[in-house]
Design a protein with these regions (language model features):
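Short, hydrophobic beta-strand segments that form beta-sheet elements in well-ordered domains
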Residues: 101-103, 125-132
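Conserved binding/catalytic microenvironments
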Residues: 1-122
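Structural alpha-beta junctions
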Residues: 121-126, 142-146
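Peripheral docking tails and interdomain loops at the edges
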Residues: 131-169
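General small-molecule cofactor/ligand-binding pocket signal
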Residues: 78-80, 127, 146-148
């Protein structure tokens, strides 16, 4: 419910620049609540998920909400945040060796940039989501990537990604 409202606020600033303040306020209220959901969901024997927004993506609430869904689904999540450089994502994937990497983008340009030069994520399954990735043709996505249509479908995609890679968690 909240993310579509934030998206409308974010798009409405073109007509009313005052809406930017409302979007920033709402973001600052929601961010710590979503982080608390992640902090309370650590499970030692759980499958692991690395979550980030790609380089150039300033909006983080979508991917943070997706990380919270992953945690609620049973994943132990490491959240890297917005504007994550490709090299940092690669290093994190090499170090943490997650079962799934979750990347979300609101903007088409950050999503397109990620797809044009995807990071080496090792054996991790890749799940992408958000309006930026939704706007791209399926053949523009990195090989093997799964696209989550919305947060409601995300837990199914995460489960399918685990099953496709033979990870039992």
């Amino acid at each position: 419910v909240v993310l579509p409202v934030l998206r409308d606020l974010g798009e409405g600033w073109r007509e009313d620049p005052g809406l930017i303040a409302a979007e920033h306020f709402a973001t600052n209220v929601l961010r710590p609540r979503l982080h608390r959901l992640l902090a309370g969901a650590h499970r030692a024997a759980a499958p692991t998920c690395l979550a980030a927004a790609p380089e150039g993506e300033d909006h983080e609430l979508g991917v943070l909400a997706a990380a919270a869904v992953a945690a609620d689904t049973g994943f132990r999540v490491t959240y890297l945040g917005s504007r994550t450089p490709r090299a940092a994502l690669e290093r994190s994937a090499a170090t943490l060796r997650p079962d799934v990497v979750l990347v979300g983008a609101v903007g088409v340009d950050p999503a397109r940039g990620f797809c044009a030069d995807p990071p080496d994520l090792g054996a991790a399954a890749l799940v992408v989501g958000g309006p930026g990735f939704a706007a791209l043709d399926a053949d523009a996505l990195p090989a093997g990537a799964r696209r989550a249509g919305d947060l409601a479908a995300l837990s199914r995609e995460l489960g399918a990604a685990l099953g496709a890679d033979g990870v039992t968690g």
